[in-house]
C-alpha cells in the first residue's frame, strides 16, 4: 500500500482535489457545477504555470525562489511597453524574452558559478524586485489596453485563450518529460548527478535550461496576471514562489530531485487555488487561506517523510532478508528422554 501511494502521488493528489470539490457540494448544491470548475481553473492558471516551471527546476534537485519577482518584473515590462504604444504581440514576446533571460541568469549562477540554488535565487529575488520598483518608481501601472484583457475573456467552453494555451503547455510538457530522452535528462540530473554525467547527459546545460524555462513560465504568468486584473500593482508576484513550490510538493515532486510528474504539480496548484473558493463558500475570512494552505503543506511533508522512511526500511529488510539465518530449532526435551530409555 505504501509503495502504491509513493509511486502514484498524482492519483492521491487527484483524489484530494475531487474530495475538496465534492464535499462542499453537500453544503451548497450550486457549487457542484461546470461554472465552479471554470472559475477555479481561471484563478489557478498563474499558479499552474509557475508550478510547471518549478517542476523542471526541482527535478534537477534545485529550487528557485525568485519566480515571484520575475513574474512581477515581467508584468511591469509588459505594462510599460503597452502604455508606450507597442503592439500586444511585440510586448508579449519582449516579456517572455525577459523572463527567459532572468531564468538563464539564475541557471548560470547555479550551474557554471556553482552557487547553491537557494542562495543564488535569494539574491536575484531582491535584484529583480528592485529592478521592478526602479522601473515603476513604486507606482501602479494602469490604463492597460482592452485587447490585453481579451486574452482572459471566455472563448470556448467558458475557457479563455490563455486557458487553452495553458492546457496545451501542460500536455506538451507532460509528454516531453515522460516520452523523450531530453525530458528524462531532467530526472537523471536530479536523481544521480555523477551517474547522469557518465551516461553522457550535459548536466550543466540541463540545469540552465530548467531555470531558463522556469523564468519563461514566470513571464507568461505575469502576462496572465496583467490580463486578468487589468492593472499591475507594485507588489505583483510577492509570495508566489512559495505557493509554486508548495503546489509541486503537494503534487508529489520530490525536494530531493529526480521524481515526480508535471500532472501532479498541476493538481497541487489546483488544490491550493480551490481552497480559496471553499473558504468563500464557508464564509471564512480570506486571510485564513495561507494558514490552511501551510497546514496542508506541512501535513503532506510530514506524511511524505514518514512514507519515505517506511519504504526505506522495507527495502532494507528485503535486501538483507536472504542473509539472515533463521534461529536453530530447539528439540523437545521429551524426545531426548525417550531415546535414552531405549
From Swiss-Prot:
Gene Ontology annotations for the cellular component aspect, listed alphabetically: ATP-binding cassette (ABC) transporter complex, substrate-binding subunit-containing; membrane; plasma membrane
Signal peptide: none
Keyword list, A-Z: Cell inner membrane, Cell membrane, Membrane, Transmembrane, Transmembrane helix, Transport
Matching CDD domains: TM_PBP1_transp_AraH_like
Annotated compartments: Cell inner membrane
Ranges per topology, Periplasmic: 1-13, 60-69, 114, 178-212, 273-283
Membrane topology: Multi-pass membrane protein
Cytoplasmic side: 35-38, 91-92, 136-156, 234-251, 305-342
Transmembrane segments: 14-34, 39-59, 70-90, 93-113, 115-135, 157-177, 213-233, 252-272, 284-304
Stated induction or repression of this protein's expression: In the absence of AI-2, repressed by LsrR. Induced by AI-2, via release of the LsrR repressor. In the absence of glucose, induced by cAMP-CRP by direct binding to the upstream region of the lsr promoter.
Any one of the GO BP annotations: autoinducer AI-2 transmembrane transport
Entry-linked Pfam families: BPD_transp_2 (PF02653)
GO molecular function, a single term: transmembrane transporter activity
InterPro entries: ABC_transp_permease
UniProt main location, coarse: membrane
Domain of life (superkingdom): Bacteria
Complex formation: The complex is composed of two ATP-binding proteins (LsrA), two transmembrane proteins (LsrC and LsrD) and a solute-binding protein (LsrB).
Function statement: Part of the ABC transporter complex LsrABCD involved in autoinducer 2 (AI-2) import. Probably responsible for the translocation of the substrate across the membrane.
Similarity remark: Belongs to the binding-protein-dependent transport system permease family. AraH/RbsC subfamily.
Protein name: Autoinducer 2 import system permease protein LsrC
Organism for this UniProt entry: Escherichia coli (strain K12)
Gene that this sequence comes from: lsrC
Amino acid at each position: 500500500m505504501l509503495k502504491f501511494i509513493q509511486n502514484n502521488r498524482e492519483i492521491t493528489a487527484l483524489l484530494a482535489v475531487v474530495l475538496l470539490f465534492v464535499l462542499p457540494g453537500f453544503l451548497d448544491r450550486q457549487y457542484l457545477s461546470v461554472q465552479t470548475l471554470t472559475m477555479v481553473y481561471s484563478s489557478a492558471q498563474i499558479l499552474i504555470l509557475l508550478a510547471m516551471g518549478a517542476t523542471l527546476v526541482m527535478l534537477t534537485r534545485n529550487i528557485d525562489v525568485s519566480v515571484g519577482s520575475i513574474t512581477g518584473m515581467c508584468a511591469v515590462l509588459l505594462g510599460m511597453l503597452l502604455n508606450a504604444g507597442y503592439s500586444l504581440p511585440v510586448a508579449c514576446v519582449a516579456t517572455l524574452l525577459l523572463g527567459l533571460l532572468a531564468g538563464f541568469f539564475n541557471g548560470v549562477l547555479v550551474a557554471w558559478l556553482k552557487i547553491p540554488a537557494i542562495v543564488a535565487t535569494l539574491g536575484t529575488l531582491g535584484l529583480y524586485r528592485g529592478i521592478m520598483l526602479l522601473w515603476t518608481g513604486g507606482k501602479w501601472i494602469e490604463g492597460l489596453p482592452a485587447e490585453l484583457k481579451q486574452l482572459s475573456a471566455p472563448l470556448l467552453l467558458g475557457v479563455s485563450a490563455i486557458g487553452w494555451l495553458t492546457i496545451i503547455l501542460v500536455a506538451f510538457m507532460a509528454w516531453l518529460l515522460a516520452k523523450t530522452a531530453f525530458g528524462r535528462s531532467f530526472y537523471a540530473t536530479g536523481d544521480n548527478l555523477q551517474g547522469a554525467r557518465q551516461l553522457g547527459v550535459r548536466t550543466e546545460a540541463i540545469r540552465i535550461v530548467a531555470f531558463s524555462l522556469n523564468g519563461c513560465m514566470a513571464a507568461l504568468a505575469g502576462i496572465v496576471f496583467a490580463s486578468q486584473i487589468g492593472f499591475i500593482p507594485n507588489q505583483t508576484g510577492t509570495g508566489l514562489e512559495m505557493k509554486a513550490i508548495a503546489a509541486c510538493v503537494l503534487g508529489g515532486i520530490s525536494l530531493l530531485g529526480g521524481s515526480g510528474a508535471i500532472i501532479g504539480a498541476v493538481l497541487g496548484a489546483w488544490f491550493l487555488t480551490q481552497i480559496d473558493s471553499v473558504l468563500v463558500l464557508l464564509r471564512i475570512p480570506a486571510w485564513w487561506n495561507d494558514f490552511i494552505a501551510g497546514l496542508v503543506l506541512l501535513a503532506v511533508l510530514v506524511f511524505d517523510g514518514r512514507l519515505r522512511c517506511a519504504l526505506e526500511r522495507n527495502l532494507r529488510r528485503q535486501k538483507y532478508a536472504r542473509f539472515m539465518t533463521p534461529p536453530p530449532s530447539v528439540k523437545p526435551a521429551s524426545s531426548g528422554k525417550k531415546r535414552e530409555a531405549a
